[in-house]
């Protein structure tokens, strides 16, 4: 998640995500999703690529819930992989970004699935692709990025628990065991 992705945007950010922390546990993973405004004249990925191709470079905007997080980097990678110049519009959280997408102020939004699922199910946002190894049971008609030839994007967000660097191994092991117990 942001812990690791932030370094790509801010290499002098003051920490090394590998050297400065001791991993304790992976807490959860969630799929990412690309959704579009319902007014975008596209029904699927190919239509969206055509739509973007007809616009001036930078005219199509994509929102994320912030700067330098995994969704921002996903949007930049998506833009690069399809050979288009999209404009990133960072928000202070996913909620305001989704509201503006549904309100027509933006064309695209890169988000985690839990944040956008209600908008998708209520037909207030149209899903384009999911970042996950397989199609989702909740959205079986939505292809994965890998199916669209964009396999570099095909992973979700992970939420992990870390401690300061050089944590003694016995404490790391205990924290991992307690975390597993609490999470089960």
Segments from the language model and where they lie:
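Short beta-strand->loop
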Residues: 16-27, 63, 85-89, 107-108, ...
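Hinge/capping helix and adjacent helix->loop/strand transition within the periplasmic-binding protein
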Residues: 8-96, 145, 158-184
């Amino acid at each position: 998640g942001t812990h690791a992705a932030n370094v790509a945007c801010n290499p002098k950010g003051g920490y090394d995500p590998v050297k400065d922390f001791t991993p304790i546990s992976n807490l959860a993973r969630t799929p990412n999703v690309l959704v579009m405004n319902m007014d975008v004249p596209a029904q699927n990925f190919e239509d969206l690529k055509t739509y973007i191709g007809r616009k001036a470079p930078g005219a199509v905007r994509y929102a994320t819930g912030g700067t330098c997080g995994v969704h921002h980097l996903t949007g930049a990678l998506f833009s690069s992989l399809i050979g288009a110049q999209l404009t990133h519009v960072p928000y202070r959280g996913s909620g305001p970004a989704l509201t503006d997408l549904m309100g027509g102020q933006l064309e695209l939004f890169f988000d985690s699935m839990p944040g956008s699922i209600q908008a998708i199910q209520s037909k207030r946002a149209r899903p384009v692709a999911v970042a996950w190894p397989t199609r989702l049971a909740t959205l079986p008609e939505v292809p994965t990025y890998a199916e669209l030839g964009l396999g570099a994007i095909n992973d979700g967000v992970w939420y992990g628990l870390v401690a300061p660097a050089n944590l003694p191994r016995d404490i790391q092991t205990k924290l991992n065991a307690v975390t597993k117990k609490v999470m089960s």
